[in-house]
Amino acid sequence: MSAKTNPGNFFEDFRLGQTIVHATPRTITEGDVALYTSLYGSRFALTSSTPFAQSLGLERAPIDSLLVFHIVFGKTVPDISLNAIANLGYAGGRFGAVVYPGDTLSTTSKVIGLRQNKDGKTGVVYVHSVGVNQWDEVVLEYIRWVMVRKRDPNAPAPETVVPDLPDSVPVTDLTVPYTVSAANYNLAHAGSNYLWDDYEVGEKIDHVDGVTIEEAEHMQATRLYQNTARVHFNLHVEREGRFGRRIVYGGHIISLARSLSFNGLANALSIAAINSGRHTNPSFAGDTIYAWSEILAKMAIPGRTDIGALRVRTVATKDRPCHDFPYRDAEGNYDPAVVLDFDYTVLMPRRG
C-alpha cells in the first residue's frame, strides 16, 4: 500500500489523551437542508419555516439538530471508526450554538478511554468529540465508544481505562435558544395542540407510520455527511462479510425515527441533548422502520415558564409495527426487531 494513502487507525494506534483534528471543515448550505428534507421528510415547523423560527426569536429556520450531529460525526469516521466493527453507543451529547445555512463546522476528538477485548483481536475506543462553528462556538459535543479491529493481534494491550459516562445531561446544562410567546405560537402550523404540560412520565406513544429503507437513499444520506465507513458502501467486500450485504448507517435510523416521531411529538422543537443511544441490531435496505416513544422525565427549565424539557426514549424497529411497544424481555434482552434505543432530551413549549 502506498504510504500516501490512509488505511485508518487500528486499535493499537490510539493513545489515551490523544487529540485528533479531523478533516474537512464543512459549510452547510441550503442545498444540504433540501437534500436532508427529501431523505427523511421531517415536518417539524422550526426547521421548515423561517417565519415560525422568527416567532421563537431566531433569525431564520435553523439546521436540524440531527443534520448537525451527522456532519460533526461524519468528520470523525476516517480517523476513529474506519476500521470499526461496531459503533457501540453514545452519551453526554449536548447541542450548543444554533447552526444556520452558511455556517462552517469542524470537529476535534480526544481519546478518553481504551479497553482491549478478551479475544485480543479488537478493542473499544472511547472518544469525546466536539464540533464548533467558524467562530469556535461549540455546536455539539458528545461521547461515543466504538469497537475497532487490531492491525496486529499480538500487539500489547494498553492500560485499560474506561471513563465514567453520565446517565443523562442535566437540565441546567441545556442550551435553550428559543423564547416562546403563547400569543405568537401557532399550534396549527406546529401540527399539534399537545404541549409540554400535556405529557406524563411513563406515557408511551406509537408513532404509527412506517418507512422502508432504499439502498440508494441510505447511501446518499451517508455520503451527505461525508461518512466514509466502508460497511455502508462497498458491496464487493461486504458480500463476503458477516451479513453478506451493506449495513445502513445507524444515524440514518436515528433520523428516520425522529421524523416518524412528529406523529405524537410535533411540538418537540429540537433535540437539546443525547443522553444515550444504542444500535441494537443492524438494518439493511428493504427493512421497514417503525418507532414508538416513552416519556422518561418532564423537566422544568430553571428561570423559564415558556418552555420545558422532555426526556424521551425512542425505540425503532424493523418490519414490526409498534402498537404493543416492543422493547426488552424479562431478562433484559432486546426484542429481535428493535434496531435503535435512543434516549434524548427535547425542548417543547409550555402553556402560558
Curated annotation (Swiss-Prot):
Reaction it catalyzes: (2R,3S)-beta-methylmalyl-CoA = 2-methylfumaryl-CoA + H2O
Domain MaoC-like: 16-129
Pfam family, one: MC_hydratase
Gene3D superfamilies: Hotdog Thioesterase
pH curve summary: Optimum pH is 7.5.
The EC number(s) this enzyme carries: 4.2.1.148
Binding site for substrate: P62, I63, D64, S65, I85, A86, N87, L88, G96, A97, V98
GO MF annotation, one: oxo-acid-lyase activity
Coiled coil: none
Cross-referenced InterPro entries: HotDog_dom_sf, MC_hydratase, MCH/BMMD, Thiol_ester_hydratase_Rv0216
One annotated GO biological process: glyoxylate catabolic process
Keywords: Carbon dioxide fixation, Lyase
Induction: Under autotrophic growth conditions.
Source superkingdom: Bacteria
Described function: Involved in the glyoxylate assimilation cycle used to regenerate acetyl-CoA and produce pyruvate as universal precursor for biosynthesis. Catalyzes the reversible dehydration of beta-methylmalyl-CoA ((2R,3S)-beta-methylmalyl-CoA) to yield mesaconyl-CoA (2-methylfumaryl-CoA).
Binding partners and assembly: Homodimer.
Listed PANTHER family: BETA-METHYLMALYL-COA DEHYDRATASE, MONOAMINE OXIDASE-RELATED
Protein name: Beta-methylmalyl-CoA dehydratase
Organism the protein comes from: Chloroflexus aurantiacus (strain ATCC 29366 / DSM 635 / J-10-fl)
Gene, per the UniProt record: mch
